[in-house]
Amino acid sequence: LAPRAVRQLLVRLLDIMLAFPDLLLALLAITVLGRGPENTLLAVGLAGIAGYARLVRAQVLQVRLSGYVQHAVALGEPPMVIILRHIVPNTLRPLLVLATVGIGYSILSASALSFLGLGVTPPTAEWGALLSEGRNFLDSAPWVSLLPASVVALSVIAITLLGRRVQTLIAKGGIA
């Protein structure tokens, strides 16, 4: 769709982003954007977008060369129909599975940023900030840190289990 030079530039930019850990990119984005809930979410999202973009690109290239898309082109279907009927649904399936894993990773990243004091600022309650505040009381009141740590862990486990279930449903053909 885009000229070749633009595509190559975007692919190289994605490669550069993938060369760095997501948390490091999120730290960089937080320093540029500033602290706050919206900026934390934006930083975590921007840091992880390269993986999604590469997956979508690879899926589109693979589906575009598949037999059923080639048949649709040969039959004269309009490009928009081919995109909406064949390419988008077959690209969304693996993206949905990756998104469930990404949500768990985003929860951990946002909590880590807040734990370091770079995410959401007090008095807003955030799991990482609660963990950071509770570490001063680990000797006398360990439950202060245990509760937010448990909630973070349980949330990530629940999202991961949901992702596995979605992957199983997709493999069985239960999700279109």
Task: Give the predicted meaning of each segment.
Residues 1, 54-61, 156-165:
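A hydrophobic alpha-helix feature that marks transmembrane segments and, especially
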Residues 1-3, 75-77, 121, 173:
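A short glycine-centered flexible hinge/capping loop motif at secondary-structure junctions
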Residues 1-54, 58-59:
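Generic hydrophobic transmembrane alpha-helix motif, especially the helices
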Residues 5-7, 11, 61-65, 69-97:
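Amphipathic cytosolic juxtamembrane alpha-helices at the membrane-cytosol interface
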Residues 23-28, 36-45, 95-130:
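Non-cytoplasmic
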Residues 33, 37, 44-47, 93, ...:
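C-terminal transmembrane helix and the adjacent membrane-cytosol boundary/short C-terminal tail
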